């Protein structure tokens, strides 16, 4: 067995290098190609440049706050009103079920 340089990383040891070069493909076979491909592609560990972060909002500006999404209640209220009107038509204004023959307060015409 040949002596191995202790300062050399393990993927550069003799016999540990794969026959094919590394590529940019992220398929399962290429992710397990070698130790370096596994850490970069399989685990997503990269010691390259970090992405630039957005600067933090200055605390001195009171108007600069995180936007809060508005609640859209107008549409819900319209739907509720329509449903209440529909229920009122079906039951009558007193809340009792409408009997077509004996209904005097409902706008229904008997025979419909």
Swiss-Prot record:
Region: Cysteine-rich, residue numbers: 22-37
Main location: host cell
Domain of life the protein comes from: Viruses
Positions bearing the site annotation: Essential for Tat translocation through the endosomal membrane: 11
Biological source species: Human immunodeficiency virus type 1 group O (isolate MVP5180)
Name of the featured protein: Protein Tat
Composition-biased stretches (Polar residues): 93-112
Segments for region (Interaction with the host capping enzyme RNGTT): 49-82
């Amino acid at each position: 067995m040949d002596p191995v340089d202790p300062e050399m990383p393990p993927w550069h040891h003799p016999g540990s290098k794969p026959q094919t070069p590394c590529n940019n493909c992220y398929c399962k076979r290429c992710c397990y190609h070698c130790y370096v491909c596994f850490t970069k592609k399989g685990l997503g560990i990269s010691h390259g440049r970090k992405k630039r972060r957005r600067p933090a909002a200055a605390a001195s500006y009171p108007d600069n706050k995180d936007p809060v999404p508005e609640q859209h209640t107008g549409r819900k209220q319209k739907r509720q009103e329509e449903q209440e009107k529909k229920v009122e038509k079906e039951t009558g204004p007193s809340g009792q079920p409408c009997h077509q023959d004996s209904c005097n307060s409902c706008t229904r015409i008997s025979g419909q």
